[in-house]
Amino acid sequence: MSQEKQVFSIDLAGRQLTVETGQLAKQANGAVLVRYGDTAVLSTATASKEAKNVDFFPLTVNYEERLYAVGKIPGGFIKREGRPSEKAILASRLIDRPIRPLFADGFRNEVQVVSIVMSVDQDCSSEMAAMLGSSLALSISDIPFEGPIAGTTVGRINGEFVINPTVEQQEQSDIHLVVAGTKDAINMVEAGADQVPEETMLEAIMFGHDEIKRLIAFQEEIVQAVGKEKSEVKLYEVDADLNQAVREMAEKDMHSAIQVHEKHAREDAINEVKKRVIEHYEAQEADADTLGQVNEILYKIVKEEVRRLITVEKIRPDGRKGDEIRPLASEVGILSRTHGSGLFTRGQTQALSICTLGALGDVQILDGLGVEESKRFMHHYNFPSFSVGETRPMRGPGRREIGHGALGERALEPVIPSEKDFPYTVRLVSEVLESNGSTSQASICGSTLAMMDAGVPLKAPVAGIAMGLVKTGEHYTILSDIQGMEDHLGDMDFKVAGTAHGVTALQMDIKIDGLSREILEEALQQAKVGRVHILNHMLSVIAEPRTELSAYAPKIITMTINPDKIRDVIGPSGKQINKIIEETGVKIDIEQDGTVFISSINQEMNDKAKKIIEDIVREVQVGEIYEGKVKRVEKFGAFVELFSGKDGLVHISELALERVGKVEDVVKIGDVITVKVIEIDKQGRVNLSRKVLLKEEQEKEAAKEENKQEQQ
């Protein structure tokens, strides 16, 4: 590869995308700087010279955010980037998934792909720049990568598809799709949508693939110009004689074990065969490498037989038909003190989801590279080891948990009511209690049940289903509601979530080169049938959201004040608002447009806080009459509190009908008197009169007396 800087450009959605090679990170196997608008991402690919002694392909993909890219200094005491943000973890997974299938089976050299985001133009996706950069860094390197791949985002505005929509366009779009693939096929899909029909989603995917072909042609030109010759790497292979011997010893028994329908019984039967074969070779004092090869051969026997049964005999490991859903069971309200709970069970997969409602002040604050500063809807997914009957250390969420949580969040967000209609922060936590595949989709179903139990007025209930594929040559079988073994040994994990009206989320991962339009279309239609079946089951448990919130959920009242009065409610250094909070125990959130949200479990305290705020922002009008308490007495008059935070002056001459020598002769501190507003001066000072009201009363009495005399 030439070590001199070279620049290549292409127009992408009306903005220039530029690739620079030969200047930065020259010690990496491959490196490119991708500029898209003002976004700049440095992508590098590095590989170990020797294969690792592992039974898998050790690929690591990192998407690294730097806050200098948006002109920010990290918060906190240390003032440097810490652990990756959720967005960075999701971007790493997004890049990993289309790249991983394009390395040869048996390639065991460690590969690391790193993309550092150095500058961000919000209208030009840094994730898509990083995906293109990662593919190019691998393609121009000497690493044996069978790409390139490319990815693009697709939106839809007023029925028209848009490539790489800007921030403004994304707000108007009802589809948020990321699609990646090779020039021949699609191999990764990630999408959120606002209840969009399957046919439209398929059209959006194919629309994105047309752009992908153009980006791949662009990459091929760059590889032609600056690419290195690919290294000759010896791929891992098991010994042919050993392979034959193990197969003769284990195949028949393994085939019988695989056809045990119950998960744990099947695993025990398979492990018994493995144990017998391993013990045979241990007795012959086989070394660790040989035992490793034996394990790999046994794994291949299982994989081949499972795939043969599915594609040839149309038999699934648990005996179901291809489009059959496992038995369903659901329950709501099983946790008394939570705001809402839903238990969803599908075969041996079980998720318990809990809904918690909070004030708008409980929103999650986001400190990253995006334009979004906070979010009021969250879904978190936990996968403890006991869910699969194993033991392991309990640590924080990993990439998988974060990815599954984000998928559930994306699926449910389109049906969450607006802040105006439901002024709450909503947090969902899905605890996976049993796992045999499709746990992320079970968490979506459980979360829908939990929100309906909590009284969240969803636009429509959402269910999710995971579809699988086993493909051999031109023959393939699409599976509904895949279980763990089918996911592990199959070619596709295609998750589809949505309502009865359309799709709200898609996620597709595949282990083969790519999928055709026909297979995608069939999978989407089969998923729709399964999704509607699951929705009908859920609605038989709870038909609609509860009309009342839990007694333990906060009550929120909304009021609107003049935006100019916000400063009065807050007070200097927050003194006034903190006083209200301390006095009532409520939470208060104020929007810039003057909308005030008051929340507390105690409705009486909510009402009290509202009254205080109303008094603070109330405008005094000339001619209004108040009953107020005398707060202060001076020689020239008395100061009367009309309502909380607002005083007025009754001049000594306005205290009584007769001449007053001393204010104290008429009123003293603590007296409650009725006064009328007679003037508000240019400085906003309120002048009051008691005399005017006394005179009016005197005149009324005189008029009454006169009427009485006339009637006599």
Curated annotation (Swiss-Prot):
Enzyme class of the recorded protein, top EC level: transferase
Catalytic activity: RNA(n+1) + phosphate = RNA(n) + a ribonucleoside 5'-diphosphate
EC assignment: 2.7.7.8
Any one GO CC term of the record: cytosol
S1 motif domain sequence ranges: 623-691
GO molecular function, one term: RNA binding
Domain KH: 554-613
Signal peptide (UniProt feature, chain positions): none
Record keyword RNA-binding present: yes
HAMAP family cross-referenced by the UniProt entry: PNPase (MF_01595)
Family that this chain belongs to: Belongs to the polyribonucleotide nucleotidyltransferase family.
Function of the protein: Involved in mRNA degradation. Catalyzes the phosphorolysis of single-stranded polyribonucleotides processively in the 3'- to 5'-direction.
PANTHER family noted in UniProt: POLYRIBONUCLEOTIDE NUCLEOTIDYLTRANSFERASE, POLYRIBONUCLEOTIDE NUCLEOTIDYLTRANSFERASE 1, MITOCHONDRIAL
Full protein name: Polyribonucleotide nucleotidyltransferase
